Amino acid sequence: MSRWGAPPLLRNNKRGKKMRKLLFGTVMMALAPFCSQAALAQSDVTLKIITPAVTANAGIRDLAMGFEKEMGIKVQIVTLNMAKMVDELKSGTPPADIVFLPYALMDTAQTEKNVANGSRINIGRVRIGLAVHKGDPTPDISTVDKLAAVLKAADSVMYSNPASGSMEARIIDGMLNAHPEFAGVKRKISMNGEGGQAVARGEGQMALQLICEIVNHPDQLTSVGPVPDSLGAYIDSAAAVTSRSAHPKEAAQFLKYATQPGTYSLWLGKGLERMK
């Protein structure tokens, strides 16, 4: 379960852009004591992180910048389609040092000993939400019936292409197929990027999208909020040091840095609810 449940920040995005800037500044100040003992000289180590978009868009980039600045250790972030993550973990060159994966894939990675024993950290949950054009009304989607009414009233509801291997797209497609309340929704698959990006380009009225991929377009999109919990439309993610890491000590340092209490507000501001 989430630390906070459905966070108010994600339900009301009117002040989202300013709030995210404030949160980032606050988090960087909070992290300063963590790094007070760190050598600021540049290290010759470069950590390679492999991650799907769900966690790449939910705070990793900001944390990597802070880690590089404070610890002097470079971080390379490689964002991959979910379908390519496991192959890259097992045989990518150079080998990854840190991997972010949904729970089920991380469970398998542990069983197959592709991650270091005891290094797994459960990161958090990113929910599917509804995106509308910035400035458009934000409807009530707090129940399945209300969400269905909003979606059916739209000229088009965009989402990513399930055939691309996107876990997010499969979750959305499965949600719409599994519930009769959504019969009649005018679905439109984005053939060029995310559904939210398509809405931002003017190709549709609204989009179902991971919230972390809505709030990163503050000038074009507004996050109406997450879909109801009963729909099970979310991705829970974990991180671990890989068993092939050339820099396991530094990789463990990054995970400790990225998951200390002072980072909670940054993750939340990017659409990820930290887990207990």
Cite the ranges covered by each PLM segment.
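Bacterial N-terminal signal peptides
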Residues: G25-F34
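Leucine-biased recognition of intrinsically disordered, low-complexity hydrophobic segments
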Residues: L9-L10, L22, L40
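Short, Lys/Arg-enriched N-terminal segments with co-localized hydrophobic residues
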Residues: R3-K18
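Exported/periplasmic ABC-transporter solute-binding proteins
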Residues: Q42-P95, Y103-E112, I121-V126, V132-K276
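Bacterial N-terminal signal peptides that target proteins for export
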Residues: K17-T26
